[in-house]
A protein has these predicted regions:
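Macrodomain-like recognition of ADP-ribose-binding/processing modules
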Residues: 1-128
Length: 128
């Protein structure tokens, strides 16, 4: 069942929070920044993951905090090519591939609830 709500996604009782980002994102603005502020260790683990695994757009990376909150980072944008550059815009194919991976993750892990913003409509630049 899908229920549309408004408000601060960080206050959600959902088991999982998912959002769209770019590989090597610096989590400096938008929801990513709020997540970085709420779970600094997630950002540290994310940086390590990106440096060692070199993720591609259209995939995902999930993280679970000490409070059992799960954050799924959907790679909906191309990575910045050089240090200090902005990442590319989101594309519908990247969003679709990442959402398919999210569905597989939900099915395999038996997640019961998910909070998902309007993907890639802020920094990603897509229309809702």
């Amino acid at each position: 069942m899908i229920i549309e709500v408004s408000g601060d996604i960080l206050l959600s009782n959902a088991q999982v929070i998912a959002h769209g980002i770019a590989p090597n994102d610096d989590f400096a603005i938008g929801l990513a920044h709020s997540l970085r502020e709420s779970w600094p260790s997630m950002y540290k683990d994310f940086r390590h993951f990106c440096q060692t695994q070199h993720p591609k757009a259209g995939t995902l990376w999930s993280w679970m905090g000490a409070d059992s909150k799960i954050v799924v980072n959907l790679f909906t944008q191309e990575a910045a090519y050089h240090q200090g550059e902005k990442p590319g815009r989101a594309t519908l194919p990247h969003v679709n591939h990442a959402l398919r991976e999210l569905r597989h993750l939900i099915d395999s892990e038996k997640f019961t609830s998910l909070a998902l913003p309007r993907l890639s409509t802020g920094v990603g630049g897509l229309d809702w």
